[in-house]
Amino acid sequence: LVDVGTENSAGDRCAYTMVSKDDYGEVKRMVGRMDGLLRYEHYVPQNLTNYYEYLDYYALSAQMPETYQAAYDFIQPVIDTVNRMDTDSEKVKYLNDYLCSLLTYDKKSVAGIIRTFAPHSEELKGACGDYAHDFKFLCGAAGIPCFTISTTNHAWNMVYADGQWLHVDVAANDLYRQNYILLAKTVSDRTDEAPEATAFLKELLAPGSTK
């Protein structure tokens, strides 16, 4: 741990953990998968340069940013409906269909949680990453363990539903207008590029689920 502050700049004091250049990509990918579990901190000490290289900087709080409160309020009626359902599978299917009703797939567009879960009259387009992050947001609000698997060219989710980890690809389900990958035990046409990170997150979100 390194303290970059001084006696005259107490407000700029911080500590960070450095990783090797070879490990940096893997560690950053892990932190990215934990988005929603660990909040990205936006304050940057004035005397800390290249802060994005120091991974602890991204894992300072387990609280959801206050900027998402409006999104939470927007989806509350949906969450109330989901909470009355009997099984996790029912809940996941409902949330999948709900998100498909809000977004239209376009790999060149960016929607984001705040835009997706807000009143809008125009067609809202998003890429696979938008679907994956939005779906994780919905699952989190519904109390369903969920994380995002991101590869070099695609992103989808895994959810812990009714005692097992299953794949959900809302973007593909919306694009093909069918339940293409919805609560699937395996996926044959997708490769998890960080299986160790996946195993770690499964145990983090649902202890004992991989044993």
Regions found by a protein language model. Name each.
Residues D130-D192:
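Hydrophobic/aromatic-rich core segments of domains that either
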Residues L1-F74, A172:
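Linear, non-domain "peripheral" regions
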Residues T116-Y131:
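A short, highly charged nucleic-acid-interacting micro-segment common to nuclease
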Residues V4-E7, L37, T81-M85, P207:
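Surface-exposed polar/charged interaction patches
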Residues Y58-Y68, L95, W165, A172-K211:
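Intrinsically disordered, low-complexity repeat and linker tracts
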